[in-house]
């Protein structure tokens, strides 16, 4: 369990750097003499770095010992955040953020594979959920603390603190993490071939389609809660914390449920998420009920993730690391599409309320794909057969 705690802390440290930027954008913009909109490119560039760079870097580092690779990735994260803290202008800061983004999904993919392979196959989703708890903590603790540090000592202190946390993570990995060697990994070309299989492509599609709806609502929670729900802007941090707490419990419980019966619970969780989105639409103008809706959406929005990640790993058993990196990119693509198309809906004459129904419909599409994939997995080339063969 110690190695899991170490990896969880490393994930917490790295992903805090991803989530915290939104909270310090005004300070960055003011200090570097750019508009808040221009400073927002830090978020866009980071996402682009994860989408493109994560899979490429993972493919290029296929043959490297996992422990040494994770040490190198943490070193890059330390350097990227340190350069961010010392950046003399916006362009160097933007470049440093892109470099840091390159290692985020690669490290998470390595950590997931290492964690899952240290546990019995029937506990794969549970282990993924426990590791992802570090990401949940980054959302509900790391980002607020980093924002507070930025408000107290300046945004540069925020990046310096993240660099320090990554440095501590590097020390812990070097001290206690056991190197598994190459653990039977194949070449990059062989792993790319694995990603072309129909079950793998279906699993990746489920991640993208199944998440875009809830991400659309999350991206526009502020107008949904203030314009429709009647909440004052000052209450938004508390409501976001409510979402984060729901997400934390959903992530942990979703992993346990998937391991107990993936054929039953993964479709059920997606169906309940779609129903929760419809319920969110129906109570959108009630201040009290929207608080409950936010917590429920956070719960089911994250309860579906461990099972999705476990399915990707099972269908791509010969290339789990690259598959997880591509899966993370798929999630980021879903987030980008959610922001883009959600904005079009929110700016329409109907206002933001239809976001709930559009999100429910998209989630239902993810449910359909999951049911189809579950039925197909009963064939001899199913994900279970692949997992058993390995």
Predicted regions and their residues:
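Cytoplasmic helix-loop-helix junction between adjacent transmembrane helices
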Residues: 96-135
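Conserved MFS/SLC helix-loop-helix module at the cytosolic interface between two early adjacent transmembrane helices
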Residues: 52-88
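A late C-terminal transmembrane helix in Major Facilitator Superfamily
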Residues: 315-350, 359
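Helix-loop-helix hairpin linking two adjacent transmembrane segments in secondary transporters
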Residues: 90-92, 120-178, 224
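Helix-breaking motifs and short loop linkers at transmembrane-helix boundaries and internal kinks
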Residues: 33, 65, 86-92, 283-285
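C-terminal transmembrane helical hairpin of 12-TM major facilitator-type secondary transporters
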Residues: 264-308
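Helix-to-loop junctions at the C-terminal end of transmembrane segments
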Residues: 54-66, 250-262, 346-347
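Paired small-residue
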Residues: 80, 91-100, 288-296
């Amino acid at each position: 369990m110690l190695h899991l705690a170490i990896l969880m802390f490393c994930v917490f440290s790295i992903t805090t750097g991803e989530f915290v930027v939104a909270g310090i954008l005004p300070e960055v913009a003011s200090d570097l003499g750019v508009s808040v909109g221009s400073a927002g490119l830090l978020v866009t560039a980071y996402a682009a770095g994860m989408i493109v760079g994560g899979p490429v870097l993972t493919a290029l580092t296929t043959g490297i010992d996992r422990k040494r690779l994770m040490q190198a990735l943490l070193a890059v994260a330390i350097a990227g955040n340190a350069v961010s803290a010392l950046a003399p202008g916006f362009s160097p800061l933007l470049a440093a953020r892109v470099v840091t983004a390159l290692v985020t999904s690669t490290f998470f993919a390595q950590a997931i594979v290492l964690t899952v392979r240290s546990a019995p196959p029937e506990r794969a989703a549970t282990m993924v959920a426990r590791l992802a708890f570090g990401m949940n903590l980054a959302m509900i603790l790391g980002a607020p603390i980093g924002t507070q540090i930025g408000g107290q000592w300046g945004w540069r202190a925020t990046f310096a603190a993240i660099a320090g946390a990554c440095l501590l993570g590097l020390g812990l990995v070097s001290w206690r993490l056991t190197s598994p060697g190459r653990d039977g990994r194949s070449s990059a070309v062989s792993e790319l071939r694995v990603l072309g299989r129909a079950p793998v492509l279906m699993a990746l599609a489920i991640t993208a389609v199944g998440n875009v709806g809830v991400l659309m609502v999350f991206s526009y929670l502020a107008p949904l809660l203030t314009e429709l729900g009647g909440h004052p802007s000052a209450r938004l941090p508390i409501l976001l914390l409510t979402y984060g707490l729901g997400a934390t419990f959903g992530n942990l419980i979703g992993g346990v449920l998937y391991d107990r019966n993936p054929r039953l619970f993964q479709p059920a969780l997606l169906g309940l998420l779609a129903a929760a989105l419809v319920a969110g639409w129906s109570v959108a103008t009630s201040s009290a009920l929207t608080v409950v809706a936010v917590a429920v959406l956070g719960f089911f929005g994250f309860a579906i993730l461990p099972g999705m990640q476990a399915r990707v790993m099972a269908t791509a058993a010969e290339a789990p690391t690259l598959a997880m990196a591509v899966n993370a990119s798929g999630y980021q693509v879903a987030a980008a599409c959610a922001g883009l198309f959600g904005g079009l809906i929110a700016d329409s004459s109907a206002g933001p309320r239809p976001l709930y129904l559009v999100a429910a419909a998209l989630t239902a599409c993810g449910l359909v794909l999951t049911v189809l994939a579950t039925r197909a997995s009963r064939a001899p080339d199913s994900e279970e057969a692949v997992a058993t063969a390995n």
